[in-house]
């Protein structure tokens, strides 16, 4: 993962953790957890691609990796919709900027995971 993506994840997670969204803070914590999970999954796919011969290892270690890949894309789509919803309802400029950057990052990560998965197939 390039250093810009790493710092983007860290920055967004830090800023999201500082937000107070009232009764929806549980939802925000869930989003933060999913962002962290997505980052770890993206990192592991990237490492597998860098080793290129790791496809067999990946398949042996987890025969359901394609199913997991599909689940990750569903999570990304859910996060995109959730971030879009938050963006529509917030009037706080700090939150708007954070959610816009989170949305941009989700699109970038979705594309990177797609690219990695095609290289592994």
UniProtKB/Swiss-Prot annotation:
<feature type="short sequence motif" description="Nuclear export signal">
    <location>
        <begin position="85"/>
        <end position="94"/>
    </location>
</feature>
<keyword id="KW-0946">Virion</keyword>
<dbReference type="GO" id="GO:0039675">
    <property type="term" value="P:exit of virus from host cell nucleus through nuclear pore"/>
</dbReference>
<feature type="short sequence motif" description="Nuclear export signal">
    <location>
        <begin position="12"/>
        <end position="21"/>
    </location>
</feature>
<keyword id="KW-1048">Host nucleus</keyword>
<comment type="subunit">
    <text>Interacts with protein M1. May interact with host nucleoporin RAB/HRB and exportin XPO1/CRM1.</text>
</comment>
<dbReference type="GO" id="GO:0044423">
    <property type="term" value="C:virion component"/>
</dbReference>
<dbReference type="Pfam" id="PF00601">
    <property type="entry name" value="Flu_NS2"/>
</dbReference>
<comment type="function">
    <text>Mediates the nuclear export of encapsidated genomic RNAs (ribonucleoproteins, RNPs). Acts as an adapter between viral RNPs complexes and the nuclear export machinery of the cell. Possesses no intrinsic RNA-binding activity, but includes a C-terminal M1-binding domain. This domain is believed to allow recognition of RNPs bound to the protein M1.</text>
</comment>
<dbReference type="GO" id="GO:0042025">
    <property type="term" value="C:host cell nucleus"/>
</dbReference>
<keyword id="KW-0813">Transport</keyword>
<keyword id="KW-0945">Host-virus interaction</keyword>
<dbReference type="InterPro" id="IPR000968">
    <property type="entry name" value="Flu_NS2"/>
</dbReference>
<comment type="similarity">
    <text>Belongs to the influenza viruses NEP family.</text>
</comment>
<protein>
    <recommendedName>
        <fullName>Nuclear export protein</fullName>
    </recommendedName>
</protein>
């Amino acid at each position: 993962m390039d250093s810009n993506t790493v710092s983007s994840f860290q920055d967004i997670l830090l800023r999201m953790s500082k937000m107070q969204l009232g009764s929806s803070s549980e939802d925000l914590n869930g989003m933060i957890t999913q962002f962290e999970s997505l980052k770890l999954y993206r990192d592991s796919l990237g490492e597998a691609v860098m080793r290129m011969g790791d496809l067999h290892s990946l398949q042996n270690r987890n025969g359901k990796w394609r199913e997991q890949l599909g689940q990750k894309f569903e999570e990304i789509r859910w996060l995109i919709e959730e971030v879009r919803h938050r963006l529509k309802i917030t009037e706080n400029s700090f939150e708007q900027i954070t959610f816009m950057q989170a949305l941009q990052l989700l699109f970038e990560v979705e594309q990177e995971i797609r690219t990695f998965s095609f290289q592994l197939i």
